């Protein structure tokens, strides 16, 4: 029996979410695999299926407000970005602004904590 990829995709396209869920469970049992372990490499490749939610891998650290300790926030911005004093002050004065762009989750969380410890309001996008 020849495999007809187009017919298979047509059948998948016509299935309901419940039917797709049952199919995934049957595949897991038949082949001894887990959909969770298959989802991680797919998310990294950028091609996740409709039933699999992609986890965000790049974050922007956005300075919303400097707060009362502006000098401490400027120092933190300088440490995080390597900017000069004037550039860091301009960035803080112009809030909301991106402090870091395209950072991985760990770096973004660390930057957020550092800025919040200095007294700033920060958001990850």
Curated annotation (Swiss-Prot):
InterPro entries: Ribosomal_bL12, Ribosomal_bL12_C, Ribosomal_bL12_C/ClpS-like, Ribosomal_bL12_oligo, Ribosomal_bL12_oligo_N_sf. The keyword Glycoprotein does not apply. GO terms for molecular function: mRNA binding; structural constituent of ribosome. One of its GO terms (biological process) is translation. GO terms for cellular component: cytosolic large ribosomal subunit. Keywords: Ribonucleoprotein, Ribosomal protein. The keyword Ribosomal protein applies. Pfam families: Ribosomal_L12, Ribosomal_L12_N. It comes from the Bacteria. HAMAP family: Ribosomal_bL12. Belongs to the bacterial ribosomal protein bL12 family. Forms part of the ribosomal stalk which helps the ribosome interact with GTP-bound translation factors. Is thus essential for accurate translation. PANTHER family: 39S RIBOSOMAL PROTEIN L12, LARGE RIBOSOMAL SUBUNIT PROTEIN BL12M. Homodimer. Part of the ribosomal stalk of the 50S ribosomal subunit. Forms a multimeric L10(L12)X complex, where L10 forms an elongated spine to which 2 to 4 L12 dimers bind in a sequential fashion. Binds GTP-bound translation factors. This is Large ribosomal subunit protein bL12.
């Amino acid at each position: 029996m020849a495999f007809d990829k187009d017919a298979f995709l047509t059948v998948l396209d016509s299935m309901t979410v419940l039917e797709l869920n049952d199919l995934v469970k049957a595949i897991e049992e038949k082949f001894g695999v887990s959909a969770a372990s298959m989802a991680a490499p797919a998310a990294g490749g950028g091609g996740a299926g409709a039933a699999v939610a992609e986890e965000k891998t790049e974050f922007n650290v956005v300075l919303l407000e400097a707060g009362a300790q502006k000098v401490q926030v400027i120092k933190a911005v300088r440490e995080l970005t390597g900017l000069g004093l004037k550039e860091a002050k301009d960035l803080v004065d112009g809030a909301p602004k991106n402090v870091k762009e395209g950072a991985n989750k760990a770096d973004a969380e660390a930057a957020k904590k550092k800025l919040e410890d200095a007294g700033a309001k920060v958001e990850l996008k």
